[in-house]
Amino acid sequence: MFDNLSERLERSFKILKGEGRITEINIAETVKDIRKALLEADVNYKTAKQFTDEVKAKALGQNVMTAVRPGQLMVKITHDELANLMGGEAAEINLKGNPAVILMSGLQGSGKTTFSAKLANYLQTKKNKKVMLVACDVYRPAAIEQLRVLGEQINAKVYTGEGEANPVIKAQKAIQEAKVYGYDVVIVDTAGRLAVDEQMMQEIAAIKQAIDPQETLFVVDAMTGQDAVNTAKEFNDRLDFDGVILTKLDGDARGGAALSIRSVVQKPIKFIGTGEKMDALDVFHPSRMADRILGMGDVVSLVERAQEQYDEEEARRISKRIAKNQFDFNDFLSQLAQIKKMGSMKDLMGMIPGMDKALKGVEVSDDAFKPIEAIISSMTPQERSNPSLLNGSRKNRIAKGSGTSIVEVNRFLKQFEQTSKMMKKMQQMQGLRRR
């Protein structure tokens, strides 16, 4: 999402290249260029001005050490101010309550219903909570059905309250049922509208007053830019919500909403949606997002995702097979599945420092795995277990069966061989370190 902004900021920092120290003159040009970059990214004008004024003041107040070049100092100051702009620290979701009630609000099409299910999945899998979803959009049967289907996917109870046309009463009844059956969290998905209107505001305000939620969250589509900020302000003025959810942050929008919304409404961004899958949800960490904006990657989040998907028993099994030179295509496919569970390739590449720049102009897609999976799937069980069996005629058969070419098959086999050797070497090095 922040690719263009990252490039523009990098250009801004280059203005100070070759400068021995920061002065009023060279900092003025740099700050002006940073402000222009932010405005091009659809950041709110007032926010952009306040941000650059703060950066300028901090930069002029620094005594640059001889070991730190002005350009490096500007990167550090900009990083810290970006993190502050987006809230400084990650904001925890309030789950105190019996049950804890979370009220979802937002416009139609913002991804509110999908995010409600993602949040339920997150609370069930990461926080070990028993969650009930409540379908309070009484105007769109499709929205109720959507939540029901998503609930089935994540194995969460969905309260539909069939026959009840009053969303306030439906929400109240759902919470009563949740108390009876021992649910820890109730997530109330409300009706969206194509635009903010008085009827909508009155209805959701009435629901909030009736159920007194621990959290009222505003869901907004990050792709809508400044409209997202304006809508957030209108909702906050009427609802006084507790936090913001930014959806579709994996899209190609300029990113202005993520940078503006916190300073405009003075409410934290709590979660971000980064894809269609039910686990495509991340707690929002301002400092990590600042890292990504400045092209530094997000190694901490990458490691966290890897740890979440880490299967210790499987890792031991693979390790033993590598040690015995038995690593085969079945094992390779197993490792590929583990990587895919971590998220989209585009998202993962964005977390690796410098990778965005290295892959500039290259379309990173999960489809890259498909030819490999097709090639392995076209092998016989014996071939998967014994790579040395693959002679010319077998390769031709695999190429035809997988819809690929013999060149692609040979390329993959070479990559597989190199991967096997590298894994063997790494294991040997680890063994030497332990001695």
Listing of model-derived features with the role each one plays in the protein:
Residues 2-19, 288-435:
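Long amphipathic alpha-helical segments used for membrane anchoring, targeting, substrate engagement
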Residues 8-136, 143-164, 171-190:
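Primarily NTPase-proximal linker/entry elements flanking Walker-type ATP/GTP-binding cores
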Residues 16, 42, 78, 107, ...:
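Residue-level signature of catalytic and energy-coupling elements of molecular machines
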Residues 39-40, 57-60, 83, 87, ...:
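Generic secondary-structure signature for well-ordered alpha-helical cores
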Residues 127-132, 154-158, 184-186, 211-216, ...:
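Short, surface-exposed connector motifs at secondary-structure boundaries
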Residues 161-166, 220-224:
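Conserved helicase motor
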Residues 171-175, 183, 195, 199-209, ...:
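Conserved phosphate-handling catalytic cores of large alpha/beta enzymes
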